[in-house]
Amino acid sequence: MGRVPLAWWLALCCWGCAAHKDTQTEAGSPFVGNPGNITGARGLTGTLRCELQVQGEPPEVVWLRDGQILELADNTQTQVPLGEDWQDEWKVVSQLRISALQLSDAGEYQCMVHLEGRTFVSQPGFVGLEGLPYFLEEPEDKAVPANTPFNLSCQAQGPPEPVTLLWLQDAVPLAPVTGHSSQHSLQTPGLNKTSSFSCEAHNAKGVTTSRTATITVLPQRPHHLHVVSRQPTELEVAWTPGLSGIYPLTHCNLQAVLSDDGVGIWLGKSDPPEDPLTLQVSVPPHQLRLEKLLPHTPYHIRISCSSSQGPSPWTHWLPVETTEGVPLGPPENVSAMRNGSQVLVRWQEPRVPLQGTLLGYRLAYRGQDTPEVLMDIGLTREVTLELRGDRPVANLTVSVTAYTSAGDGPWSLPVPLEPWRPGQGQPLHHLVSEPPPRAFSWPWWYVLLGALVAAACVLILALFLVHRRKKETRYGEVFEPTVERGELVVRYRVRKSYSRRTTEATLNSLGISEELKEKLRDVMVDRHKVALGKTLGEGEFGAVMEGQLNQDDSILKVAVKTMKIAICTRSELEDFLSEAVCMKEFDHPNVMRLIGVCFQGSDREGFPEPVVILPFMKHGDLHSFLLYSRLGDQPVFLPTQMLVKFMADIASGMEYLSTKRFIHRDLAARNCMLNENMSVCVADFGLSKKIYNGDYYRQGRIAKMPVKWIAIESLADRVYTSKSDVWSFGVTMWEIATRGQTPYPGVENSEIYDYLRQGNRLKQPVDCLDGLYALMSRCWELNPRDRPSFAELREDLENTLKALPPAQEPDEILYVNMDEGGSHLEPRGAAGGADPPTQPDPKDSCSCLTAADVHSAGRYVLCPSTAPGPTLSADRGCPAPPGQEDGA
């Protein structure tokens, strides 16, 4: 019992000593609570708190970090009275909030107050930052040539330290985390395929992964660009392609510019003073012949080759020059004047391009019974001939030609002698031994006059040809301006003997694939059997004309579809012909069929233009027909029976195409045609594809597509199936039901995908049968498997058509006269209001009346035109829209 009181006594003494020590440490300080310590990860939120008790008015608490005042600190101060008299004693609590903790927030924090002229500072609290590594630098995307070294950078920091980096290529680690050093820079010797790189930062808290950088491998710069052969109008160049990794080269682009004065100023720069013209060529071979160039003309060329990953860097500009050519025309104004035994011959330099450096002139003269004599005159343009001998020279004529290092140019027409006239200048004495002259035996003035007339005709023809050549080619006709896709067109002039070429030679000259040529051989038609008529429609790249095809026993009225090959690229030519051969396999009353293909010579270039021969469609395309029936000068009413028949025809044609494993991809009312029997034919197979394996087709290249008609899965993944055409058919049904309205009015093309993903669909048209709209809605199911087949659609539409009553003339017709003064009439009667329209006076009535069908949903009033607007039943013909009465 004696030991226990002793232990309590010792403990009480120790507590008293400690309390005395704390009182000394905190003597006079008002702080009763000091800031604590915070350790957190980057981005977290922390709070520091301090408390003090004071007598009298509460002071303002200021926060310090590392001894510096925090001017913009997010702190709150709370004051609580402790005594009954609020002026006696106060408790003050200050809280500092640190949001989104960063490395700069770490340090020592204290509270500071000023009381009675003294400054008091609390005990410090510490804020530390510890968490996952933070990236200061991440790898960036790059495009590098194949097998070319490059560097990537990545840098991260803690705390806590140390931070080590691990590089990954295509999600595979390149090296393990070892040691305490970070590999900030990755040096790669080169790649042969496009790869992705990222880095991982490791510390004691865990791992952070950087962004993924894509390194695209491009072909190396081509090298050894050189000239293989030179001609006056041709250059053959070759080059060695650079490495392209695992991606084969698809094509090369050749740029060429004329070397104007001052070319040396921009030769070392990337861009010349004017935009160069670009020619795209397929490879291999890595060789190209440039034709139709200007003789004796300097050019600069460079080359870049492309793979599926992108283009290589351009080579340096290479100066090249064509060789000299012969002069294009003879010397001008050749004259030969006789003065006794001397003949003075004069001429002027050719006005047309010399195509080289003029080296001199050659002169030839001969008489009626004497051989021709050739002389090299040099660069002079005047020479005197002295005729000697016993025999006179009868009917002497003179011709002159200019020559360059490439040879002689054209000779001038033979010029007869003229008598000497005073004032012609002093002749040069170039003596030539000849027999003595004798008088001409017949009047030579007539010969001179005829020669002058002939020379004038030749001169006019030569000037016309030269002017045409200058106008058509600055670069010699090898290059043409760019077209919409950015490709360049190679144009050339063939001989006028094109009409004698065989079909095989014509196909070979087009530069198309062997597979397409094989298909075209089966559908070729003799060009002379086709007669062209008026133009039905014309666009930027082609036209449709009315024509006649002479068959063995009859003449068939056809539509002829042509292409302006002078402004189209080779790929567009192949697309045009592929659409034609696509139709040769079709044999169905509701599918456009192909009659044949032929080629005609271009009047301007002589290059064969493709011509596709199709059946003649009297009423044009379905969309225009529907639109003009509603908005044309003479609107007509289309009964529901006719609209349903249009839908059934299209469904029947698409059912046939689906059985042939064809995907249309561009089904719309504009691509359906109406023949003379008002039957619809599915047409325009420019985007159609035949699927040989499986039941879908994935589009490889980005092409212009009608997004408002495309199925939602095709917009997302560019995957097309027969059920994608079913979606488009539903939109086409909506077009027909609305008489040609545009789908999704008010919705931009760029917004269609999001609009459909939200579950939105086309609304039910006015006066559309509920069953028809339900059929449309089934075509727009999100899951393609839930959509009906074309066989089901055709059957449902045919049953709907059978269930409808026969089309008859409307029982209730409303006639409204809309004269110039009709604008003051009350509109509510005509719009379906309670009051009927006032009956006009018969004497003021216009003889031009418009019939409007009255439905249960409301009445329609159509403004009159110069002739009454008839109603159209399913078994009656319908006038075509203006400008569309004929067409394919």
UniProtKB/Swiss-Prot annotation:
Belongs to the protein kinase superfamily. Tyr protein kinase family. AXL/UFO subfamily. It catalyses: L-tyrosyl-[protein] + ATP = O-phospho-L-tyrosyl-[protein] + ADP + H(+). Residues 467-888 are cytoplasmic. ATP binds at L536, G537, E538, G539, E540, F541, G542, A543, V544, K561. Residues 1-18 form the signal peptide. Residues 221-325, 330-422 form the Fibronectin type-III domain. Residues 530-801 form the Protein kinase domain. GO terms for molecular function: ATP binding; phosphatidylserine binding; transmembrane receptor protein tyrosine kinase activity; virus receptor activity. The lineage of its organism: Eukaryota, Metazoa, Chordata, Craniata, Vertebrata. This is Tyrosine-protein kinase receptor UFO. Monoubiquitinated upon GAS6-binding. A very small proportion of the receptor could be subjected to polyubiquitination in a very transient fashion. Its EC number is 2.7.10.1. It comes from Mus musculus (Mouse).
